[in-house]
Amino acid sequence: MPTTPSPLALAQGLIRCPSVTPEEGGALAYLAGLLAAAGFSVERPVFSAPGTPDVENLYARIGADGPCLLLAGHTDVVPPGEPALWRHDPFAGVVEGGELHGRGAVDMKGGIACLAAASLAFLAERGPAFGGSIAFLVTGDEEGPAVNGTVKLLAWARARGERFDHCILAEPTNPDALGDMIKIGRRGSLTATLTVLGAQGHVAYPHRAENPIPGLIRLAGALLAAPLDEGTAHFDASNLEFTTIDVGNPASNVIPAQARAVLNIRFNDLWNPASLEAELRRRLDAAAGNAVRYRLDVQPTNAVAFLTQPDAFVDLVTAAIEAETGRRPALSTTGGTSDARFIKEACPVIEFGLVGQTMHQVDERVAVADLDRLAAIFRRILDAYFPASPPPAERA
């Protein structure tokens, strides 16, 4: 059986490509070469949108019959900041003390390397006729606007007749140790600006002005007075946070003309953006009455809450993780949003990857042992998802 590259070698190769979003940096080209050499058909479509950079993406597939397992991720990374603050060059892929250092080691070039290493080893042993299909869907637009990436790549694939049965997105899901957590859903995110209107005037003549600040305090209090919900079996309670309050008034002797607050809600699957906006307006109208003039501007959002119901596929992934790590992972929907919100429109999706403690930080790094174990977990998943047929003698 031919030797296939280790997850460490693949991760180093990806990290050494400076693919700071939206730059491709050679990362997709590197991955495309590996997959093409293993027999995948590979395409690299570029998508555009007004006001956003053009972004290159990758789609690769091997096999035509049977179930299709989609393996997804992104090769773009956030900027490293000041390189002098790093122990090693953030794009050198240095191993020190059993850890691989570099931007993207955790989020998420390490995860992609493990998906690729597992797939290449699986194909080297089983060959191309393994009773199904494996597809890679990798974008260079996840850390940026997320406009010309996964959402368009999925639409492009769908228009070509591509269909997927299940997906693994290799985001760093584990809080402390490999095997801690699988993400089976994500909360939605909604941002809105609340503006209370007043009338500017001199503070010494308040009867000639209308101060919007008391009205803003009143309306903000109404939004926070009662919880939005109590949560569900798989989701925490929805949470509203004010992130800024501002009047844009540098003068201490002037009553401002308006006061503004920005809020963000991370919501569970009891809500959608329309129903959540309706609830906000209901609370605001009740508190404002005829005394407070306000405007609520809700930003469009594509981050809607979703849940992949625990089923046989989730059980298969859980069993692979437990067999390799000895830990039974929690099924969680915590944290921020991810490209899983787009993939769930194509097929059931779960997220599992590395330990996320150093993602987006200076000296981002991952234990080499975790790369090996994550690749082993993915290999177990592939073996279970595409079980080998018994030899003819055993079938008889």
From Swiss-Prot:
NCBIfam families for the chain: dapE_proteo, PRK13009.1
Cofactor binding comment, as recorded: Binds 2 Zn(2+) or Co(2+) ions per subunit.
UniProt keyword Membrane, yes or no: no
Record family assignment: Belongs to the peptidase M20A family. DapE subfamily.
Reactions mediated catalytically: N-succinyl-(2S,6S)-2,6-diaminopimelate + H2O = (2S,6S)-2,6-diaminopimelate + succinate
Domain of life: Bacteria
CDD domains found in the cross-reference section: M20_DapE_proteobac
Gene, per the UniProt record: dapE
Quaternary structure note: Homodimer.
Protein's pathway: Amino-acid biosynthesis; L-lysine biosynthesis via DAP pathway; LL-2,6-diaminopimelate from (S)-tetrahydrodipicolinate (succinylase route): step 3/3
Residue sites binding Zn(2+) 2 per the record: D107, E143, H360
Residue positions binding Zn(2+) 1: H74, D107, E171
Physiological role: Catalyzes the hydrolysis of N-succinyl-L,L-diaminopimelic acid (SDAP), forming succinate and LL-2,6-diaminopimelate (DAP), an intermediate involved in the bacterial biosynthesis of lysine and meso-diaminopimelic acid, an essential component of bacterial cell walls.
Single GO BP term: L-arginine biosynthetic process
Entry EC no(s): 3.5.1.18
InterPro entries per record: ArgE/DapE_CS, Bact_exopeptidase_dim_dom, DapE_proteobac, Peptidase_M20, Peptidase_M20_dimer, Peptidase_M20A
Keywords: Amino-acid biosynthesis, Cobalt, Diaminopimelate biosynthesis, Hydrolase, Lysine biosynthesis, Metal-binding, Zinc
Names of the cofactor(s): Zn(2+); Co(2+)
Iron-sulfur in keyword set: no
Cited Gene3D superfamilies: Zn peptidases
Organism, as annotated: Methylobacterium sp. (strain 4-46)
Enzyme type, top EC level: hydrolase
Name the record gives this protein: Succinyl-diaminopimelate desuccinylase
Active site (UniProt): D76, E142
GO-annotated molecular function: acetylornithine deacetylase activity; cobalt ion binding; succinyl-diaminopimelate desuccinylase activity; zinc ion binding
